[in-house]
Amino acid sequence: MDNRLLEILVCPLCKGKLEYDRAAQELICHADKLAYPIRDGIPVMLADEARQSVPGRVIEPDAPAGN
């Protein structure tokens, strides 16, 4: 996930910040407890496509580009 894209994407429901879960290929909104899927490298930012996220799940940070 491109960090520049992640900086401008927000949750479509609450407009809150999203966190990238590389392992699950999802964008997580902690405020709404929703996980938006990333399919073929494209974030699907539709509320109908989101699933309930797992509370307390630890998300490993994405490695910086070039590492």
Swiss-Prot record:
InterPro entries per the UniProt record, alphabetical: Trm112-like
This protein's name: UPF0434 protein RALTA_A0561
One Pfam family here: Trm112p
GO cellular-component term (any): cytosol
Organism placement in taxonomy: Bacteria, Pseudomonadati, Pseudomonadota, Betaproteobacteria, Burkholderiales
Record family assignment: Belongs to the UPF0434 family.
PANTHER family linked to this entry: PROTEIN PREY, MITOCHONDRIAL (PTHR33505:SF4), ZGC:162634 (PTHR33505)
Signal sequence region: none
